[in-house]
UniProtKB/Swiss-Prot annotation:
Cofactor(s) essential for the protein: prenylated FMN; Mn(2+)
NCBIfam families named among the record's database cross-references: UbiD family decarboxylase
Keywords from the UniProt entry: Decarboxylase, Flavoprotein, FMN, Isoprene biosynthesis, Lyase, Manganese, Metal-binding
Protein known as: Anhydromevalonate phosphate decarboxylase
């Protein structure tokens, strides 16, 4: 795993993978942490490799303010991977999850959860490969239950069900942050996320031939099949809102092989509801929102799903306002692009969308409630929103915190130009 972080915190105290490691990780919300002594296991644990925008930007060689454009560029111009290797650098055995220090995070969790596992599968009809992160609950040493939401892998699974044939998969854990980021991107179903990763890597990405799949050189790779006939209860699990998600009946994964790197392997555990969880789930939605807003307001500068909004429910959008009404058009475009978005605030380019205090300043000095507040009741929202109705509907709010073009001189920020 290639980690570009000079400030790694190493914990040498012996800790249990049940609750104790997670408790320790919560002390370091924005640090990269290695737990070197996990009770009963040989493998150390690493966490926090993607828990700040700065780390993510560094992994794809750009500034924080350029992340959205970098993702758009790589997604629109993927580079087909043409470099491959094998498992000669790995120890290959029969699958045995008891050898991996998989974490139990919180008291009411359904059990031990793999949280940084990227699942690779091929469309049973077209053969196109997909990569996506999924939480997976451990049932025993060879079985997992996977939470599958209605996206690409779900489509593949439905096709496999119709064919009556279990879906072959590989699960990669512990990889280059740029590859991990690529696996979270929202791209068309006929695109391959590893080609996006290859664009991040300037065409230099090497993958492993794993049966019919092509997977990154992760520290741990599991092989198996998603059963089209077996299910089990999945949950509870603490989701990015720091609240428990519900228990659902989900498909079972039956594992066959396990490959662990010979040279210094780590188990990557993402702390549920931590910043790494929030950023990897939310940040890749920002390009989609940006594109939608750009269609309505071509002078959009940036879009941020804020940490206070769990990187999912709240967006801050900066625009170079040209006409009255641009702010509200940006709000409507953002809400339609990301259905889970609950509150959106639009600001001018003299406001730093990465700074919560600056956003609050814009709200305090530029918003007139009866004019600038939009309320949209009875619309579909996020299943993760604790106040959403049982049918998934909620009320959404947009706040136009841009300057009125009629009285620009009143809003000049003296310190901004100094």
């Amino acid at each position: 795993m290639d980690i570009k972080d000079e400030n790694i915190i190493e914990i040498t105290t012996e800790l249990s993978s049940e609750f104790e490691v997670a408790k320790e990780l919560r002390k370091y919300p924005k640090d990269t942490v290695i737990i070197k002594n996990v009770k009963g296991y040989d493998l150390p644990i690493i966490s926090g490799i993607c828990n700040t925008r700065e780390k993510i930007a560094k992994s794809i060689n750009c500034e924080v303010s350029e992340i959205t454009q970098k993702i758009i560029e790589a997604s629109d111009n993927p580079i087909k991977v043409d470099k491959f290797t094998d498992f000669s650098d790995y120890n290959t055995t029969e699958a045995n999850l008891d050898k991996i220090p998989i974490l139990t995070h919180y008291k009411r969790d359904g059990g031990k959860y793999i949280t940084a596992g990227v699942v690779f599968a091929r469309d049973p009809e077209t053969g196109i490969q997909n990569a996506s992160i999924h939480r997976m609950l451990v049932l025993d040493d060879k079985r997992l239950v996977i939470r599958i939401v209605p996206r690409n892998l779900y489509t593949y699974f439905q096709k496999a069900q119709k064919l009556g044939k279990d879906l072959e998969i590989a699960i990669a854990i512990g990889m280059d942050p740029a590859i991990l980021l690529a696996s979270t991107t929202s791209i068309p179903i006929d695109y391959n996320e590893m080609d996006v990763a290859n664009a991040f890597k300037n065409g230099e990405l090497t993958l492993i031939k794993c049966g019919d799949l092509e997977v990154p050189q992760a520290d741990i790779i599991l092989e198996g099949k998603i059963s089209v006939s077996e299910t089990s209860a999945e949950g509870p699990f603490v989701d990015l809102t720091d609240t428990y998600d519900i228990i659902r009946d989900q498909p079972i994964i039956n594992l066959s092989k396990m490959h662990i790197k010979k040279d210094n392997p780590h188990y990557h555990g993402i702390l549920s509801a931590g910043f790494e969880h929030k950023l990897l789930q939310g940040l890749p939605q920002e390009p989609r929102i940006f594109k939608s807003v750009k269609n309505a307001v071509p002078t959009v500068e940036n879009v941020v799903l804020t940490e206070g909004g769990c990187c999912w429910l709240h967006a801050a959008i900066s625009i170079n306002k040209q006409t009255e009404g641009d702010g509200k058009n940006a709000i409507m475009a953002a809400l339609s692009a990301h259905p889970s978005l609950k509150h959106a605030v639009v600001v001018d380019t003299d406001v730093d969308v990465f700074d919560p205090q600056d956003i609050e300043y814009a709200i305090a000095t530029r918003v007139k409630g009866d004019r600038d507040l939009m309320i949209v009741p009875n619309v579909r929202g996020s299943s993760l929103d604790p106040v959403a109705e049982s049918d998934g509907t909620t009320t959404k709010i947009g706040l136009d915190a841009t300057k009125s073009l009629k009285t620009l001189d009143k809003f000049e920020r003296v310190s901004f130009g100094e």
